[in-house]
C-alpha cells in the first residue's frame, strides 16, 4: 500500500476540522484519465474476466471511484493517508468518515 497526500483547496480546509480524530476516511473521486469502459474486465492479479461492477477497475461507466484510506494526519489543507490508489492530481469529489466500524470511532 502507498502512503500519500490529498491536498484540499485552502477555502475548504475549515471543513476538515475533526477529521484527525478518525482512523479512516472514504474518498470519492473522478477517474478523470480513464477512457471508455468495458462491461467485462480482467482485474490485476486475476486470470479470469468478471463484470466491471464486481471489480475495482477504473474503466467504469460512471468514472467515479471510492477508496477507504487509513488516515495518518491532517495539517492545514493536507490530508496524509495510507492505502492511496489514485493518480497524482486526481479530482477529489468528497471526503467522508469511514463508519464501517461504528460512527465516529475515536483513534486509539
Predicted region positions:
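Glycine-rich, low-complexity intrinsically disordered segments
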Residues: 1-108
Amino acid at each position: 500500500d502507498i502512503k500519500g497526500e490529498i491536498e484540499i483547496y485552502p477555502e475548504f480546509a475549515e471543513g476538515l476540522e475533526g477529521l484527525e480524530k478518525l482512523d479512516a476516511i472514504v474518498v470519492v473521486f473522478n477517474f478523470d484519465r480513464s477512457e471508455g469502459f468495458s462491461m467485462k474486465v480482467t482485474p490485476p492479479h486475476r486470470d479470469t474476466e468478471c463484470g466491471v461492477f464486481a471489480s475495482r477497475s477504473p474503466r467504469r461507466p460512471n468514472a467515479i471511484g471510492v477508496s477507504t484510506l487509513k488516515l495518518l494526519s491532517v495539517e492545514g489543507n493536507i490530508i496524509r493517508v495510507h492505502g492511496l490508489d489514485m493518480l497524482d492530481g486526481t479530482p477529489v469529489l468528497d471526503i467522508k468518515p469511514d463508519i464501517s466500524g461504528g460512527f465516529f470511532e475515536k483513534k486509539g
